[in-house]
Every structure is written in structure tokens, then in C-alpha cells.
From Swiss-Prot:
GO terms for cellular component: cytosol. One of its GO terms (molecular function) is RNA binding. The lineage of its organism: Bacteria, Bacillati, Actinomycetota, Actinomycetes, Micromonosporales. The keyword Isomerase does not apply. InterPro entries: NusB-like_sf, NusB_fam, NusB_RsmB_TIM44. It holds the Pfam family NusB. Involved in transcription antitermination. Required for transcription of ribosomal RNA (rRNA) genes. Binds specifically to the boxA antiterminator sequence of the ribosomal RNA (rrn) operons. This is Transcription antitermination protein NusB. It comes from Salinispora tropica (strain ATCC BAA-916 / DSM 44818 / JCM 13857 / NBRC 105044 / CNB-440). One of its GO terms (biological process) is DNA-templated transcription termination. SUPFAM superfamilies: NusB-like. It comes from the Bacteria.
Amino acid sequence: MPARRKARKRALDVLFEADLRGRPPVEVLAGYVERIEKPRPEHLGYAVGLVEGVAARLDRVDELIASYAEGWTLDRMPTVDRNLARIAVYELLYVDEIDDAVAISEAVELARQMSTDDSPRFLNGLLGRIAEYATR
């Protein structure tokens, strides 16, 4: 698995846990980082950056997801999909070195591995609309 995909997976793990437990993502992240054995994986820095970035801009990210998710509310989305969308939207808007197509395809691939059969198509459409229409 490529390093950045591993980072996205780790970020998803943290955001998923924070979402389920109703705790701040940065608090869950601190506990997660403490538990990682040394030497720490090279992709950890990118994962930490994703979680911290999503947490810092969560209101804006969630607002965009809610605006472009046709027929879905954030609360109705599967937890995995909601948090994959958060990571991808953060990358689309705030991580300049990641191409939009890469951010979208990575979210779709993780959804294919970890979520429902309909999730890849849903995320592809949602993220495609956000990439095309959202103000950056």
C-alpha cells in the first residue's frame, strides 16, 4: 500500500474513532500517536496533518459535504463515508500538492475496501461535485 494511502487509512481510523466516541479528533490523535511503537512509520506525519487539518476546518468541510451530498445528511451517511469525505474535501481544498483526481480516487479506493457497495459511487459523485463547484 502506498505511503499516503496508509496515512489516509490511519487518519480515517482516528476520525472514525473520534466520530463514534464523540471526542475531539485531536484528542483521539494524541492517544493514537502515543500507542504507536518506534520507529514511527514515515507516513505518520501526513496522517497527523490530515487529522489536524480536518479538525481545524471541520465546520467548513462539513458544510461543503452537506451542501453537495444530494439526498443525504451528514448524520445519515455511514461513518466511514463521512470521514473519508472529510479527508478528501480537506485535501481538495487545502493540500495543494495533491491533485483533485488523486484525492478523489484515494477516497473511492478506501471506500471500496472499507465501506458499503454503494459507497465508492456515492463518494465519487459527491467529491467530484465539490471539486468542480466549491470555492477554494
